[in-house]
Amino acid sequence: MRNFGIILAHTYKNRLMSKAFLISTVITLAFMLVLTNMDPYVNMLRGTSEAFSAAVAGADSIQVSPFDEPIQPSTSFSRRIARNTSLILMEESHLAATQDASGGAWYVEHLTDEIIVCKFKVILILNSVREYTDVIADSIFKLSRGH
């Protein structure tokens, strides 16, 4: 998904500095911070996802933080869950037994590249259509004004 940034930048290049975009981004980040504190169990999912990503990437060691650590001193339950997360991924998902856990990632990259090519073709078509519609609109405007 290395091309995701290219797609995102191209899609939002005109909107990134708009006032509405900045306000919505700030509100979204504030909600994320508040909701993390209101529901610390979501951090358990985040920790599992991070541990899985690290294992797939081939990390030598993985340390998962207790899910309630950002809001309070961790409990014995949260420490046990954090300790067992990597063990569960290793023993039950057999991530340590595979040679290349991300072996099929080339296909996702290929599909992403195809999406980018199709998106740029559509953008080029829309830009050419917009140029023609601008010319037609200008002509109609000039005709309506009697020029």
UniProtKB/Swiss-Prot annotation:
InterPro entries assigned: Cbl-dep_enz_cat, MeMalonylCoA_mutase_a/b_cat
Record-stated family: To methylmalonyl-CoA mutase.
Protein name per Swiss-Prot or TrEMBL: Methylmalonyl-CoA mutase homolog
GO molecular function annotation: cobalamin binding; methylmalonyl-CoA mutase activity
Top-rank lineage group of the source organism: Bacteria
Species assigned in the record: Alkalihalophilus pseudofirmus (strain ATCC BAA-2126 / JCM 17055 / OF4)
PANTHER family xref list: METHYLMALONYL-COA MUTASE, MITOCHONDRIAL, METHYLMALONYL-COA MUTASE, MITOCHONDRIAL-RELATED
Native organism taxonomy: Bacteria, Bacillati, Bacillota, Bacilli, Bacillales
SUPFAM superfamilies: Cobalamin (vitamin B12)-dependent enzymes
CC per GO annotation: cytoplasm
GO biological process, one term: propionate metabolic process, methylmalonyl pathway
